[in-house]
Amino acid sequence: MMTFQNRFVLLLGLAALLAVISLSLQFFRLIPLPVGFYGEEEAKPRKRVLIDGLLKAPQALDPITESVYYCNRPNGSVQGLEGHAPVGFKLEAAHIMIRHGDRYPLYAIPNAAALNIDCNIRTDRAPFHRALEGFVAHMAQAREGRFDGPLAGFPLLPSHPRCEMGQLTQTGVVQHLMIGQHLRQTYSDLHGLLLKHESESERVRAAYVESTGRARTLQSALALLYGLRPAFDWSRLRVHHQPSASYCYAACECPARSAFQELDQRRQSRARSRDPQLARAFRDMASALDVPPARLRAAVPVDPLLAHFCHGVPFPCATSLPSPPPPPPQRSGCVSEQHFRTLRAQQLVDEKERREAGLFRRFALLVMHPFLNRTAQRLGAVAAGKPAERLALYSAHDVTLEPALSALGLAGARFPRYAARLVFELWRKEDKGRLAGGADVGGHFIRVLYNGEDVTFKTAFCQNHDWKRGTGSLLCPFQKFLDFVSRDMFAPFNSTSYYEACHHIPQPDADI
């Protein structure tokens, strides 16, 4: 029989053995430890490995959650890291591309009651913003403003008691007023990109504004500009017209771009035709609304359904049903939430596959090169000390921002929601010392932000920039962006120029 002393010795030995095993596991990092256990320099790389390699793949996107994100309802305040950089850097310029704000649908569901939304701007209803009244008053003083081309014929405010197709809503106006006020805190107040009173010699500091030929993009730009600079001087404002939603300027002719777009559209069509849940949802909706399924598919019903969801309006019913429509479960002639979930789920999968597909990536590189090249030239002019606008605003669409994100290599970015923003910031090192990695004195650097998040080190041109190990700066060298635009964007086409890449036509059966 084991004595008490022997038991104590045995337990002591077991405890020592467990301690050795535990220390061994921790030495080889086979069990997790609190961040900071090994110190800051050791903890950060280990945390990155866990995120990039060992965590499980994210679950499927929830259609309702993603729809709430897409609507971007103006609740609370806008947050973001625009205008923030390490100590010792000075902001030289910021170029902002936005998607217009919330709008009325571009399509109508056949044989369904139309969505009724008031597009008048009124300060006595939601969503309200304290700058709304001043914005409306300032738009009435636009006689001295200059608007190029068709922009001169557009109203500066949405003003219909019942919205028209594609018209900006009051929600869309408030979204951009809020973004403008957020950017004002850093770009105007902190960094002085816009002076309160520009003199003739300081005209280069005025904002450059460009909009596509749609009222909703012009109105969105004006709302953001007012939030950024309340009561701006109309006599110094000129809004340039961009004829193409792709912002391709004089380089819109690109045969390969059209070919890649057609191939990607075929891929999308094949994927949708093979989705049994989507086909069932269209059959059920068509039966409820008493229309042929093919006609319903052609109407792109997810667009008007998203408008119902964003504005908290019940999904539509057949026009033959009484008004107001019957409550569930008697809504047999109506579009259901499950129909909406199915359509949105397929759309989210399609967006994800499109971002990851080589076809769309190549299309995006070609379609967005003119804009990125123009941006690089304008930022380069600022870096060289030449007369150039320090702040530029480009008002565009989802079909502009989505390929821009793909061209930059941001395959994981979410689809551009209403009032999405993509920002390019140019920074300069202020001190006179030589930068880490041998960069020139006074070197310039670039930051890329999407909806306020710094995504610079996720871009194709700077994802390999090692800022932590003394081989580079805390910011991405501007030269990397210049090299990307002038050289690296053509590499997937085995070309050395935009013209050559545009004539590198893919085979009709290509599946890259």
Cite the ranges covered by each PLM segment:
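Short, low-complexity, Lys/Arg-enriched N-terminal segments of secretory-pathway carbohydrate enzymes
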Residues: 1-7
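Signature for phosphate-centric chemistry
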Residues: 7-208, 212-392, 396-512
